[in-house]
Amino acid sequence: MRDILHLMARKVREAERSLPRGHDRTEELYQGADGTPTCAVDKVAEDVILQLVEERDLPYNVLSEEIGFVDRRKSKTLVIDPIDGTYNSAMGLPFYSVSLAIGERSLRDVEAGLVQNLVTGDTYYAEKEKGATLNAERIQTRPFDPYKSIFLVYLGKYSSVDNFRFAKLGVRARALGCASLEMCLLAEGKVDAYYMNCEVYERSIRVVDIAASVLILKEAGGEIVDLSDRPLDMKFDLQERSNFLAYGDEEVKKVVM
């Protein structure tokens, strides 16, 4: 699994970097399977992955935010977000990724996950019960220090006012616009928590956004719960959405819940 996920990420990065200067990444081609517009850069990245799956006859179904579910009559599914942080990419903000995960039916049974920062090439990877790495070096979450806390939070048109309450609970707060990489920063011990509370269900997190990074977080010692404090599990279904709190140290919950 490791080798094929790394190959996919490398091919996506090559394809994304080969787009000509001045190429309109924001061009909306059609409505994706998840109900959001598919931009040119999303399509280029997705096509590279789908081509690899078909050429190598990989033993996976595919779930992607652009094309939806491709039933190849396999027991496992490759869950992909070809470009997570599309708007960052389109606007020239250097913080976006490709997210790749392999599992059977839901977040709970994801076996392997890879998130690559397509700007820097930094690659986060995890396999179930084998730990998490950044560029092949082990990573782990950090102990919570309320006097040095940094929280990540979703802020935008559909965010709940509760997100602003959450942001004030940390010494610093940031909103970076790429869920998979933000979750990985938490796994790496750079921040203490990551929070999303959307007022509109359809704008909450999708499983394709976080299938890989949730495994990376858990293997680094962190956890993710829904806003009722239940361990988050999401089916491999583009229609299912959720809000969440992710954290590196259980002590965070004493401050924010």
Regions found by a protein language model. Give the residues of each.
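Short Gly/Pro-enriched turn/cap motifs at secondary-structure boundaries
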Residues: 29-30, 37-41, 91, 174-176, ...
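Buried hydrophobic packing segments
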Residues: 49, 53, 98, 102, ...
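Short His-Asn-centered micro-motif
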Residues: 64-66, 116, 154
